[in-house]
Amino acid sequence: MSQRGIVLYFQVHQPNRAKPYTVFDTGIDHTYFDTASNAPWDNKAVFLKVAEKSYRPMNALLLQLLNTYPDFRVSLSITGVFIEQAREWAPDVLEGFKRLVETGRVELLAETYHHSLAFFFSQAEFERQVKQHEVLMQETFGVTPRVFRNTELAYNNDLGQWAESRGYKGILSEGWNPILEWRSPNYLYRPYGTSNIALLLKNYQLSDDIAFRFSNRDWPEFPLTANKYHTWVNQSLGDQDIMNLFMDYETFGEHQWEDTGIFNFFSEFVGSWIREYGNSFYTVSEAIDTFEPKEALSMPYTVTWADSGRDLSAWTGNKLQQEALRYVYSMEDDILRTGDESLIR
């Protein structure tokens, strides 16, 4: 009988923030990004700040846990944009991720290169970015990901079927109650209309207890200790298969600052979980190889892990956003015809 276990997945991304740019700058100022002002949109300053608060200490903690506990596992997805920034401004951060992958117990997942929602607007652009990301993972880490994760965990039936058609063995999604209804997120599922790919669902309640509520002093469960959280995971998982805890890497140190105790909490929880008989950690692929999907699950409309609506409304919720997206994608063919990689990017 397979041991029940936790699947830890962290998303690693840092966007390129556009600087303030008005209609009067059009045709005059062709520099859209800032890396020298120390303003909130200074991409270099932001990256270096988060590297110090989050990336370096979390990389060090994960490596320590991997060295301490042979059964510890974790899965990551790292965008191409993040790797570009790390190479330029903090190469040691990228080396830290390489050391994690070299342990053989950290799995890298596939995604879009630019943290893009292109799947919902341009299949060609989406597939171009996925391929670009795949090449980067091979060049940087020497691995070819076999499980797909879309930006913001955005998922629907069409994406699940696409992932199977491209040979992926699994795909991730938000385990949103209105979709699950009576079902539990603590099993593998089969994407609707597929036969050879697994769907892993985020347990959003327990994931978000760490990601969003950990340091909230108005939360009735504050403070969250490792022992309390261990009890909650035990109660939720019971005799089911897997607990999928999915969150941003920056949860540790940036969203939840070091002085909240987040790093100690995580270390203590990992140790207590492993020490309890019958518990395991799995990478995403190991979970897929270990357990059978419980049933097919249909998501006819798009679900994400963003905001309270768990949909695309954060990016497409008003007319201005919709028109901007329409206009950008209307230029796709013209831009591609230029062959100018700096423009295409």
Residue ranges, per PLM feature:
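Generic structural signal for well-ordered alpha-helices
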Residues: N59-L63, L94-K98, E127-M137, G160, ...
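Acidic, His- and aromatic-enriched active-site or binding-groove loops in soluble protein domains
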Residues: V93-A110, V143, E164-L201
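Active-site and substrate-binding clefts of carbohydrate-active enzymes
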Residues: S2-S54, N67, Y187-I197, L201-Y204, ...
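Short, well-structured secondary-structure segments
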Residues: Q3-F10, Q14-S122, R146-R149, K169-E174, ...
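CE4/NodB-like, metal-dependent polysaccharide N-deacetylase domain
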Residues: Q123-E152, W232-F246
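Short, solvent-exposed loop/turn segments at secondary-structure junctions
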Residues: V12-P15, G80-E84, Y113-A118, L153-N156, ...
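Catalytic domains of cell-wall/extracellular-matrix polysaccharide-remodeling enzymes
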Residues: K131-N186, T251-F269
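Short, charged, surface-exposed secondary-structure boundary motifs
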Residues: F119-F121, I179-Y187, D209-A211, P293
